[in-house]
């Protein structure tokens, strides 16, 4: 007969059986391997030898070093002026007033004063350009005027920049990007001549500009077409007489400068310009007060009997 098992041993055997039935968990041991890297260099902090810029400049002078001062100002280039120094006022009627009248005497006196001021400006221009001759300038100005306007026909803006100033360029090329310009010079009705010469400085006394106003009475043709080829302004085969007062400018202190067209003076007594033709609407039939549009359109479509 078997001997009875004590109660304590039965509980122990039961616990060991449950523990052996559990799945075995395999664990991996983590190994830390040190990696040798490049040692970083941290520069030491040194105290500045010179606390102020003045001490540094004094030490540099003692050592024989000349340090140029740093300029924080930005340089700008002024190739032209933004307007006219002393705008020439064309006399009303283009100086056709009799010199014996009161108005004629006043006009003649003012003209003499302006002539004296022009002579002073001519001498100042010759100080910078010894080859300048006022008698040869009107012909040169006419060539610049013609070539500048011909550049608009083929949209040669690179050449136009050399013939007109930066002030005049936007005025000539404004609103013609998608348009066709047909301009031509026919003839000169009167010889061009200089009516006023002025010189002035800008920003400082060393930046001198010269402006010459030339009177031109010519015959020209002008026609402007829109991007669809429809005529907007003028006619190519109808020449017109044009009286213009053109201002030419040059930066006298620039040894490579040249005379360029700057602006035009429009007198207040000049006739108004021809308005631009609007081609966006087709005009309909003229209606009477008692008619309607449909009735007038039906009558226009009726065949006419012989």
Curated annotation (Swiss-Prot):
GO CC annotation: mitochondrial inner membrane; mitochondrial large ribosomal subunit; mitochondrion
Keywords, alphabetical: Mitochondrion, Ribonucleoprotein, Ribosomal protein, Transit peptide
Cross-referenced Pfam families: Tim44
Subcellular location: Mitochondrion
Biological process according to GO: mitochondrial translation
Main localisation: mitochondrion
GO molecular function terms listed in the Swiss-Prot or TrEMBL record: RNA binding; structural constituent of ribosome
Start and end residues of each stretch annotated as Disordered: 287-306
Gene3D superfamilies documented for this protein: 3.10.450.240
SMART domains: Tim44
InterPro entries on file: mtLSU_mL45 (IPR051975), NTF2-like_dom_sf (IPR032710), Tim44-like_dom (IPR007379)
Protein purpose: Component of the mitochondrial large ribosomal subunit (mt-LSU). Within the mitochondrial ribosomes, required to direct the nascent polypeptide toward the tunnel exit and position the exit at a distance from the membrane surface.
Family as reported in the entry's similarity comment: Belongs to the mitochondrion-specific ribosomal protein mL45 family.
Record's subunit section: Component of the mitochondrial large ribosomal subunit (mt-LSU). Mature mammalian 55S mitochondrial ribosomes consist of a small (28S) and a large (39S) subunit. The 28S small subunit contains a 12S ribosomal RNA (12S mt-rRNA) and 30 different proteins. The 39S large subunit contains a 16S rRNA (16S mt-rRNA), a copy of mitochondrial valine transfer RNA (mt-tRNA(Val)), which plays an integral structural role, and 52 different proteins.
Protein name: Large ribosomal subunit protein mL45
Provenance organism: Homo sapiens (Human)
Gene: MRPL45
